[in-house]
Amino acid sequence: MEIHLFNEIGKVTDGPFMVHVALSTYRFDLGQIDMLFIRSVFLHNKHISCWIRIPFNIRNVDVDLHRYFSFKPKRKNERTIILARPVVFFSLPLLSPGIDNNKLAVEAMCICRFVNTNGAEFFDLEFMYEDILREFPDVGDECIKEDDHVDDFFTLGACSSATVGTVQNSTGQDHRSPVNDNNEHTVTPGPLEPPSVVRGVDSNSGNGLNNMTPGKCNGYPTGKHVWKAIDIYRLQPLHTPSDNVYRVLYDKSSFLKPRISQPPYDGLASCFFLRHEVYRFMRVIGTEIIDKFFDVMNSEDGILFQKFLCHVPMNALDISIPEMVYLSQNVWTSHVDPRSCIIKGVVAHLFKNPRRPCFVGSLTENEYWVDVIDIRQNRIYYGQKIKLAVDQETNLLTCNDKSRRYEQRAGLSVLYINTDLCCIWSFTGGFAVEFRLTLEDIGNVDLIRAVFGAPSTLFE
């Protein structure tokens, strides 16, 4: 995510300070979004603000940031920064409404939700407000001015405004100690003698300032440890001729192989309590689904019945049914995701009342949300919508769309759920187990309502 920002926060007098955003990501198909909402989450009291719809613009072109900002790079050989198409442009208020004295809420998180209403899909981008204005030390830049350079207090060298020792005379004679010379008036008096060993530091090494690398300050990151925040990765600051600064921040998903970064201070990961609560909910409901599955299996003495109308493929025996059950459940539980059919099914159940809109679309009769689990590729196709029918002759389930008869393909397992929380877990050959969830199995219902509830403007 590229957030470019003028550093004129002190000049703001009226209203919120707007941050202009250019977003490109591989995590979500931005070309299909038709609505954008933002909300604030306050970490100190866990208050969640209402969703606010904001305008945006989509361009299906690659964007050169240097041309977009109309300025030249600092160096001739500096590589250009290209945002891959499609790119979404929008602006969001940096200062959240309702904050006293219109000050920045440093303990607040911004959630941007990109919605595809046609596909009932959405993508959340989360970042801390304070991360936008956090001071990033520029690695390799001069952090200490020449006039402010400090020598070791006990090193006898040329005097400056902050050092003591002997003075080099104008004729180029050798340095002489003030103890052996009568030029006391030409030197700044220092201590009578240096200490010996204080707190494990030998006097010969002084206080270590002479060993400092020129141009770097203690306590700042080195070139190998650039500051990073969760989901946001800083590339570099961009300076314009008018001294306006643009902060360039990358969403972690912009990289094909996202970097795994550590938070800059303890507890940052725990600040994202909303996301953690969602994943905790998913782990709970995932465990319930596995338990329900085996409860039915035990009641049937371990027998799997064919519930889908299909032929058993010839290569289905490459993976036995018991192995397929274990592998499919292992793949699904290890890749649990908010896009899962289980989340969509639970949300559709909680918001069945049309007066209570949500970001997940409703289901018609005999429609299911499904997760297609590819065991061989260790991959899941989340939250697809499919409509099942009942064959009149065999009373088995079938799908009129032949391209979506997944049970006829070897190595695939499918998890179904509808708005009544009826679940079906099927395997190659149409063998399946049916079970049902309850509200008691779901757990934190209020969390799901808070996360997936939507403003009424979504359906206007």
From Swiss-Prot:
Gene Ontology CC: host cell nucleus; viral capsid
Pfam families (alphabetical): Herpes_UL17
Keywords (A to Z) from UniProt: Capsid protein, Host nucleus, Late protein, Viral genome packaging, Viral release from host cell, Virion
Q: Which GO terms describe its biological process?
A: chromosome organization
Compartments reported by the entry:
Virion; Host nucleus
Could you tell me which residues belong to the region Disordered?
167-197
The biased composition feature labelled Basic and acidic residues covers 173-184
- What family does this belong to? Belongs to the herpesviridae CVC1 protein family.
Could you describe the subunit structure of this protein? Interacts (via C-terminus) with capsid vertex component 2/CVC2.
Stated role: Capsid vertex-specific component that plays a role during viral DNA encapsidation, assuring correct genome cleavage and presumably stabilizing capsids that contain full-length viral genomes.
Question: Under which name does UniProt file this protein?
Answer: Capsid vertex component 1
Q: Which species expresses this protein natively?
A: Elephantid herpesvirus 1 (isolate Asian elephant/Berlin/Kiba/1998) (EIHV-1)
